[in-house]
Amino acid sequence: MSLRVQNILINSLRQYSKQILKPPGYASPEKTNHLKKFLVDKIRVSGPITVAEYMKTCVSAPLVGYYGQFSKDQKVFGAKGDFITSPELTQLFGEMIGVWVFHELANTGHKGSWQLVELGPGRAQLMNDVLNALAKFNDKDVSVHLVETSDALIDEQEKSLCIYTSKNSIDTPFIRKNKTRTGVNIYWYKSIDDIPDGFTVFIGNEFLDALPIHQFHKSGDSWNEVYVNLTKDGDLCFMKSKGENLHTKGLIPSAIRDDSSRVTWECSPESGTVVNQIVDRITTFGGFSLLVDYGHDGSRNTHSFRAYKNHKQVDTLENPGLADLTADVDFGYLSTLVKDRVVIYGPNEQREFLAQLGIEHRLRRLLQVCKDRKQQEQLIESYNMLMGDMGLKFKAWALFPKTLEFILEQRGGPAGFSAKKKTTEN
């Protein structure tokens, strides 16, 4: 989206959003109507929009988008929000990620300073647990870098990770700088491009699934893109393009076109951009990455775009800006974009990944120090959720520079992936 288009979008949304500019803590029950009115008016004036544009607007539009709401009291994560993430369930998840990061870092042979980058940190629960795990190894060379587009969430993350709050910086690549409770330098950025050069470890949990997707449907021998349009009554609805367009011709790979069993497909070019940015970094300056998300290896043959409100699946078009929009990550598609430049492991089921890291052993240790039976039961329940349905739906996907390929092969793969050959060999 060009800067000019972004400015037009922001100015238009401000026009519709005047009524919700209230003092902090005030949450207008009508705030989503402003976004819906904007979308309806936009479609009436300029025509149908892609699912990707609809998703991006609903998620990140200033003031009225899901993560761009004015109110800092918006409940998104956890039991009182719309969805719960693995780090919110139990400290076990973040601790295992922290152990994995340190273990793989040690096996690269890297010495000296390094950067730990998290994409889309949410309320910073994952980073909190990762740093607690790293502290046990007495690592003094790490600095933390968080990529976050929501100012309200940046405030939440700083409150969680730091003792004192700070002010936004001007004329610096980072937008905020502070120290964590354990004295680690921490920085916030709006874009991966602003992170300093250097050896970097990237982590992300439920980040890629929130990025915009394009949806396609096959009719006969032709592929059509799915758009968001209006019914005769002025309600939002889905429709198919009349024929092939620039997106069907430019995004759908020949492997999908040649698959006679395929009638639907979806992809996220924005996710592809993020993954390529990660690969550019780790192949140039050293490092590796671990992304955990809803996803599949490319074999899914149905659309996955959906919305969640209060932990229940709802209509994706009914309340734009009020529900969490998500789509399964096609790790197979992403792997094809970078397989010539990096060594890829996964996607592995989350429960397999965590089991190989020894999460059950860590569970037993934590149960021994629980205060009472109720705390033990809560821990066991969280563990079962992490390793049960969530453990099947979520996948772990790791990227390493090809310079580490021989070492990784000698080890039988990185921790958590020893039971599965790397993607580049499939």
From Swiss-Prot:
<comment type="similarity">
    <text>Belongs to the NDUFAF7 family.</text>
</comment>
<dbReference type="GO" id="GO:0005739">
    <property type="term" value="C:mitochondrion"/>
</dbReference>
<dbReference type="Pfam" id="PF02636">
    <property type="entry name" value="Methyltransf_28"/>
</dbReference>
<dbReference type="InterPro" id="IPR029063">
    <property type="entry name" value="SAM-dependent_MTases_sf"/>
</dbReference>
<keyword id="KW-0496">Mitochondrion</keyword>
<protein>
    <recommendedName>
        <fullName>Protein arginine methyltransferase NDUFAF7 homolog, mitochondrial</fullName>
        <ecNumber>2.1.1.320</ecNumber>
    </recommendedName>
</protein>
<keyword id="KW-0808">Transferase</keyword>
<dbReference type="GO" id="GO:0032981">
    <property type="term" value="P:mitochondrial respiratory chain complex I assembly"/>
</dbReference>
<keyword id="KW-0489">Methyltransferase</keyword>
<dbReference type="GO" id="GO:0035243">
    <property type="term" value="F:protein-arginine omega-N symmetric methyltransferase activity"/>
</dbReference>
<dbReference type="GO" id="GO:0032259">
    <property type="term" value="P:methylation"/>
</dbReference>
<dbReference type="InterPro" id="IPR038375">
    <property type="entry name" value="NDUFAF7_sf"/>
</dbReference>
<dbReference type="InterPro" id="IPR003788">
    <property type="entry name" value="NDUFAF7"/>
</dbReference>
<comment type="function">
    <text>Arginine methyltransferase involved in the assembly or stability of mitochondrial NADH:ubiquinone oxidoreductase complex (complex I).</text>
</comment>
